[in-house]
Amino acid sequence: MEKSKNFRIDALLAVDPPRAASTQSAPLALVTSLAATPSGPGRGGSGGGGTSSGASRSCSPASSEATAAPGDRLRAESPSPPRLLTAHCALLPKPGFLGAGGGGGAAGGPGTPHHHAHPGAAAAAAAAAAAAAAGGLALGLHPGGAQGGAGLPAQAALYGHPVYSYSAAAAAAALAGQHPALSYSYPQVQGAHPAHPADPIKLGAGTFQLDQWLRASTAGMILPKMPDFSSQAQSNLLGKCRRPRTAFTSQQLLELEHQFKLNKYLSRPKRFEVATSLMLTETQVKIWFQNRRMKWKRSKKAKEQAAQEAEKQKGSGGGAGKGGTEEKTEEELLGPPVSGDKASGRRLRDLRDSDPDEDEDDEEDHFPYSNGVGAHAASSDCSSEDDSPPPRPGGPGHQPLPQ
C-alpha cells in the first residue's frame, strides 16, 4: 500500500495538482459525456468530428473542476496506476482516422482491455468498454453518421466494420438481424476505410466472402450448369458432330467386295462370321454393305438410263435412215430422164464438132440395151450414106441411076 501511494504521489507530482484531479476523474466524465452524446441528434449526425472534440474536452481541465469530488472518492476507493489514464485517453480515435472515415476508431475498442494489467481495475475496464461501444455508435463506422450509429448492431461496433461496405445501413442491419450470413454483401471497394493488414477479424471476413463466392459460382451463377453439358452431348448425338470415318484395309475391302458379289444382303450369322474374320464389328460390316448397296443401285440405274438413251437414239436414227433410202429411190427413179436430158444437151453440142464415127460409138455405148433399129433411128440424121438404106423408087430422095 505504501509503494502504491508513493508511486501515485510521484506520478501526481509530475503534473499540476488540478490537472491530476481532472485526469483521475476522466473515466467518469468520459462515460457521462459519451452516454449523453447519442441523445443529441446534432452531434451524431455531424460525424466524428464533434464527438471527438467533446471527448477531448472531457480530458481537459475545464470539465474536471465540476467533478473533482467524485474523482477523489474514486481515487480513494480503487487506486490504479497511471497506465490506466493513457488507456482511457487512447479509447478515443485520432482525428486523422476520423477524417479518413472513422474505421480505425472501432478497431481500438476491442484492443483497449489489453492495456488494463492491474486486477483491481475490473470496474473501470467495464466502464471503458461501455464507453468505447457508445463512442463507436456515436462516431459511426462510415460516413453515414447518425444512420450508421442507429442502425448497425453492437457486434459491428465492437469488432469493426469489415472490408466490404454496405450500400444501405438500415437494410444491412435488418438483414443482419434476420440471418448472420446475409450481413456480408459483395465487395464494393472504398478507399475511405483503412484496413489493418494484420486484423484477424477482417481476414476471416474476407475468407468467408471468398467461400461465399465459390459456393455461388459452383451453384451456377458463374460456371455453367450440368444440364447445359448434357444438352450439348444430346445435340452432338443428334448429328451435329460426325463420328470418325472407318479406314478399311485393302484386304478387308477385297473380302467385303467378294462377299458382296456372292450376296448383296448378308444374314446375321454370315455377318457375324465376316466381321469376326476381318476383325471388324457387325455394325461396321452392316454399314459397309448398306453403302455398297446404295452405290450398286446408283450405278445400275445409271446403266439403265444410258441403255434407254442409246435405244432412243437408235430408234430416231433408224427412222431417219428409212426416210433417206426412200428419197434416194425416188431420185433414182426420177434421175435417168434428167440425166438423159443433160446428156442429150451435151450430145447435141458435141455432135457439131465431132466425127460421125465417134458419135456412133458413143451412141452404142450410151444405149447398150437398145436394138439396131432404134439406134439407127436415133442417129439417122448423122449417119453416113453407106449405112443408110436404099431409097424407095418414086420417093423424094430417089435419083435415077445413070445408064
UniProtKB/Swiss-Prot annotation:
The record's Gene Ontology biological-process terms are: cell morphogenesis involved in neuron differentiation; central nervous system development; central nervous system neuron differentiation; diaphragm development; dorsal/ventral neural tube patterning; endocrine pancreas development; motor neuron axon guidance; negative regulation of transcription by RNA polymerase II
Molecular function (GO) terms listed?
DNA-binding transcription repressor activity, RNA polymerase II-specific; sequence-specific double-stranded DNA binding
Q: Which Gene Ontology cellular-component terms appear in the entry? A: chromatin; cytosol; nucleolus; nucleoplasm; nucleus
Q: Where is the composition biased (Low complexity)?
A: 53-64
Question: Where are the compositionally biased (Gly residues) regions?
Answer: 41-52
Segments carrying the region annotation (Disordered) are 32-81, 299-403
Chain's role: Transcription factor. Recognizes and binds to the regulatory elements of target genes, such as visual system homeobox CHX10, negatively modulating transcription. Plays a role in establishing motor neuron identity, in concert with LIM domain transcription factor LMO4. Involved in negatively modulating transcription of interneuron genes in motor neurons, acting, at least in part, by blocking regulatory sequence interactions of the ISL1-LHX3 complex. Involved in pancreas development and function; may play a role in pancreatic cell fate specification.
Report the PANTHER family cross-referenced here.
Answer: MOTOR NEURON AND PANCREAS HOMEOBOX PROTEIN (PTHR24335), MOTOR NEURON AND PANCREAS HOMEOBOX PROTEIN 1 (PTHR24335:SF3)
Tell me what this protein is called: Motor neuron and pancreas homeobox 1
What organism is the protein native to?
Rattus norvegicus (Rat)
Tell me the classification of the organism that encodes this protein: Eukaryota, Metazoa, Chordata, Craniata, Vertebrata
Gene it is expressed from = Mnx1
